Protein backbone atom coordinates (compact mmCIF):
# COMPACT_ATOMS: atom_id res chain seq x y z
CA UNK A 1 0.00 0.00 0.00
CA UNK A 2 1.37 3.42 -0.86
CA UNK A 3 0.58 6.43 1.29
CA UNK A 4 0.14 9.97 -0.01
CA UNK A 5 3.12 12.28 0.27
CA UNK A 6 2.78 13.98 3.70
CA UNK A 7 4.72 17.02 2.51
CA UNK A 8 2.52 19.79 1.10
CA UNK A 9 3.21 21.19 -2.36
CA UNK A 10 5.25 24.39 -1.75
CA UNK A 11 3.91 26.02 -4.92
CA UNK A 12 0.31 25.42 -3.85
CA UNK A 13 1.01 26.83 -0.37
CA UNK A 14 2.62 29.91 -1.92
CA UNK A 15 -0.34 30.38 -4.29
CA UNK A 16 -2.79 30.11 -1.37
CA UNK A 17 -0.65 32.37 0.83
CA UNK A 18 -0.48 29.92 3.74
CA UNK A 19 2.32 28.32 5.71
CA UNK A 20 2.49 24.52 6.13
CA UNK A 21 0.94 23.08 9.29
CA UNK A 22 3.54 22.05 11.85
CA UNK A 23 2.71 19.82 14.81
CA UNK A 24 4.14 21.08 18.08
CA UNK A 25 4.72 19.40 21.41
CA UNK A 26 2.79 18.32 23.33
CA UNK A 27 -0.02 18.17 20.74
CA UNK A 28 1.29 15.39 18.47
CA UNK A 29 -1.36 13.66 16.35
CA UNK A 30 -5.04 14.23 15.75
CA UNK A 31 -6.22 12.79 19.09
CA UNK A 32 -4.14 15.15 21.21
CA UNK A 33 -4.96 18.07 18.93
CA UNK A 34 -8.67 17.34 19.50
CA UNK A 35 -8.15 17.19 23.27
CA UNK A 36 -6.26 20.48 23.14
CA UNK A 37 -9.49 22.44 22.74
CA UNK A 38 -10.87 20.87 25.92
CA UNK A 39 -7.71 21.05 28.01
CA UNK A 40 -6.44 24.42 26.85
CA UNK A 41 -9.23 26.76 25.72
CA UNK A 42 -8.31 29.47 23.25
CA UNK A 43 -9.27 33.11 23.75
CA UNK A 44 -11.25 33.69 20.56
CA UNK A 45 -12.66 37.04 19.45
CA UNK A 46 -16.39 37.67 19.79
CA UNK A 47 -18.30 35.83 17.08
CA UNK A 48 -19.21 38.42 14.43
CA UNK A 49 -20.56 35.93 11.87
CA UNK A 50 -23.55 37.07 9.82
CA UNK A 51 -26.38 34.50 10.22
CA UNK A 52 -27.56 32.94 6.99
CA UNK A 53 -30.35 30.35 6.65
CA UNK A 54 -30.03 27.87 3.79
CA UNK A 55 -33.18 26.03 2.71
CA UNK A 56 -32.97 22.21 2.56
CA UNK A 57 -35.51 19.66 1.30
CA UNK A 58 -37.23 16.95 3.32
CA UNK A 59 -35.11 13.90 4.07
CA UNK A 60 -35.65 11.17 1.48
CA UNK A 61 -36.24 8.68 4.32
CA UNK A 62 -39.30 10.66 5.38
CA UNK A 63 -37.81 11.06 8.88
CA UNK A 64 -37.97 14.87 8.71
CA UNK A 65 -39.51 17.56 6.55
CA UNK A 66 -37.93 20.45 4.74
CA UNK A 67 -36.40 23.29 6.70
CA UNK A 68 -33.26 25.37 6.88
CA UNK A 69 -29.68 25.03 8.09
CA UNK A 70 -28.22 27.94 10.03
CA UNK A 71 -24.78 29.05 8.97
CA UNK A 72 -22.60 32.02 9.83
CA UNK A 73 -20.65 34.00 7.24
CA UNK A 74 -17.40 35.66 8.29
CA UNK A 75 -16.10 37.85 5.48
CA UNK A 76 -12.93 39.95 5.49
CA UNK A 77 -12.59 42.80 3.00
CA UNK A 78 -11.69 41.56 -0.51
CA UNK A 79 -11.63 37.82 0.33
CA UNK A 80 -9.34 35.47 -1.64
CA UNK A 81 -11.89 32.62 -1.65
CA UNK A 82 -14.83 31.18 0.30
CA UNK A 83 -14.28 28.18 2.59
CA UNK A 84 -17.30 26.21 3.84
CA UNK A 85 -16.49 24.63 7.22
CA UNK A 86 -18.37 21.56 8.50
CA UNK A 87 -18.32 20.58 12.17
CA UNK A 88 -17.93 17.02 13.39
CA UNK A 89 -20.25 14.71 15.32
CA UNK A 90 -21.94 16.54 18.19
CA UNK A 91 -20.46 19.84 17.07
CA UNK A 92 -21.71 23.17 15.84
CA UNK A 93 -20.47 26.43 14.35
CA UNK A 94 -19.75 27.59 17.90
CA UNK A 95 -17.26 24.84 18.79
CA UNK A 96 -13.73 26.06 19.48
CA UNK A 97 -12.09 23.99 16.74
CA UNK A 98 -14.49 25.33 14.09
CA UNK A 99 -14.18 28.88 15.39
CA UNK A 100 -10.38 28.67 15.63
CA UNK A 101 -10.19 27.40 12.04
CA UNK A 102 -12.56 30.16 10.90
CA UNK A 103 -10.54 32.87 12.64
CA UNK A 104 -7.28 31.56 11.14
CA UNK A 105 -8.80 31.44 7.65
CA UNK A 106 -10.27 34.93 8.07
CA UNK A 107 -6.92 36.30 9.22
CA UNK A 108 -5.37 34.76 6.09
CA UNK A 109 -7.92 36.62 3.94
CA UNK A 110 -10.56 33.94 3.30
CA UNK A 111 -14.32 34.31 3.73
CA UNK A 112 -15.70 31.48 5.88
CA UNK A 113 -19.19 29.94 5.94
CA UNK A 114 -19.53 27.97 9.20
CA UNK A 115 -22.38 25.49 8.81
CA UNK A 116 -24.63 23.98 11.48
CA UNK A 117 -25.91 20.62 10.30
CA UNK A 118 -29.51 19.40 10.72
CA UNK A 119 -30.21 18.95 14.43
CA UNK A 120 -27.16 20.95 15.60
CA UNK A 121 -27.57 23.96 17.85
CA UNK A 122 -28.01 26.94 17.44
CA UNK A 123 -30.16 26.11 14.37
CA UNK A 124 -31.80 22.95 15.73
CA UNK A 125 -35.26 24.53 15.59
CA UNK A 126 -35.00 25.26 11.83
CA UNK A 127 -35.04 21.65 10.56
CA UNK A 128 -36.13 18.37 12.10
CA UNK A 129 -34.06 15.22 12.12
CA UNK A 130 -30.32 14.75 12.44
CA UNK A 131 -27.29 14.61 10.18
CA UNK A 132 -25.22 11.63 9.10
CA UNK A 133 -22.16 10.85 7.01
CA UNK A 134 -24.32 10.56 3.88
CA UNK A 135 -26.57 13.64 3.84
CA UNK A 136 -26.12 15.04 0.34
CA UNK A 137 -29.73 16.25 0.25
CA UNK A 138 -28.68 18.79 2.90
CA UNK A 139 -25.11 19.49 1.77
CA UNK A 140 -25.62 20.04 -1.94
CA UNK A 141 -28.05 22.97 -1.39
CA UNK A 142 -25.42 24.45 0.94
CA UNK A 143 -22.78 24.15 -1.78
CA UNK A 144 -25.20 25.69 -4.30
CA UNK A 145 -25.72 28.67 -1.95
CA UNK A 146 -21.96 28.87 -1.37
CA UNK A 147 -21.41 29.11 -5.13
CA UNK A 148 -23.90 32.00 -5.23
CA UNK A 149 -21.99 33.70 -2.41
CA UNK A 150 -18.74 33.29 -4.38
CA UNK A 151 -20.30 35.49 -7.07
CA UNK A 152 -21.64 38.14 -4.68
CA UNK A 153 -18.57 38.44 -2.41
CA UNK A 154 -16.27 39.63 -5.18
CA UNK A 155 -16.07 43.01 -6.87
CA UNK A 156 -13.97 41.74 -9.78
CA UNK A 157 -16.73 39.99 -11.75
CA UNK A 158 -15.06 36.58 -11.50
CA UNK A 159 -16.52 34.31 -8.80
CA UNK A 160 -14.27 33.51 -5.86
CA UNK A 161 -12.84 29.99 -5.61
CA UNK A 162 -14.85 27.67 -3.34
CA UNK A 163 -13.13 25.36 -0.86
CA UNK A 164 -14.39 23.06 1.88
CA UNK A 165 -12.99 21.93 5.22
CA UNK A 166 -14.62 19.32 7.41
CA UNK A 167 -13.63 18.35 10.93
CA UNK A 168 -13.89 14.62 11.64
CA UNK A 169 -17.37 13.48 10.53
CA UNK A 170 -17.67 16.81 8.72
CA UNK A 171 -14.76 15.75 6.51
CA UNK A 172 -16.55 12.50 5.67
CA UNK A 173 -19.72 14.43 4.81
CA UNK A 174 -17.70 16.75 2.56
CA UNK A 175 -16.07 13.84 0.72
CA UNK A 176 -19.46 12.17 0.23
CA UNK A 177 -20.88 15.40 -1.19
CA UNK A 178 -17.96 15.59 -3.63
CA UNK A 179 -18.82 12.04 -4.73
CA UNK A 180 -22.50 12.88 -5.28
CA UNK A 181 -24.28 11.62 -8.39
CA UNK A 182 -25.06 13.91 -11.30
CA UNK A 183 -28.80 13.53 -10.50
CA UNK A 184 -28.16 14.76 -6.94
CA UNK A 185 -26.17 17.73 -8.24
CA UNK A 186 -28.91 18.68 -10.73
CA UNK A 187 -31.55 18.51 -7.96
CA UNK A 188 -29.44 20.93 -5.90
CA UNK A 189 -28.96 23.37 -8.78
CA UNK A 190 -25.30 22.47 -9.36
CA UNK A 191 -23.51 21.60 -12.60
CA UNK A 192 -24.23 17.89 -13.21
CA UNK A 193 -20.85 17.33 -14.87
CA UNK A 194 -18.67 19.22 -12.37
CA UNK A 195 -17.61 18.66 -8.80
CA UNK A 196 -19.54 20.58 -6.12
CA UNK A 197 -16.34 22.31 -4.96
Where are these regions (language model features)?
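N-terminal presequences and immediately downstream first alpha-helices
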Residues: 1-41
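N-terminal cap/lid segment of alpha/beta-hydrolase-fold proteins
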Residues: 27-76
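Core residues of folded domains in eukaryotic genome-function proteins
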Residues: 50, 67-69, 82, 108-111, ...
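Short, surface-exposed "cap/lid" segments of acyl-processing enzymes
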Residues: 74-126, 145
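Catalytic nucleophile-loop/oxyanion-hole region of alpha/beta-hydrolase
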Residues: 95, 104, 118-161
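Short, hydrophobic alpha-helix immediately C-terminal to the catalytic nucleophile
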Residues: 99, 103, 140, 175-179
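Primarily recognizes the serine-hydrolase "nucleophile elbow" in alpha/beta-hydrolase
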Residues: 145-197
Amino acid sequence: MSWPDPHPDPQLLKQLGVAPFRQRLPWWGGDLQTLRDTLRPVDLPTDQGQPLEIQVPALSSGAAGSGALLSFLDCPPAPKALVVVWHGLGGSSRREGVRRLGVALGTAGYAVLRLNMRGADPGRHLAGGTYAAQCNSDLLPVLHRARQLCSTLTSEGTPLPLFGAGLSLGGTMLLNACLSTSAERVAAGLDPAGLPL
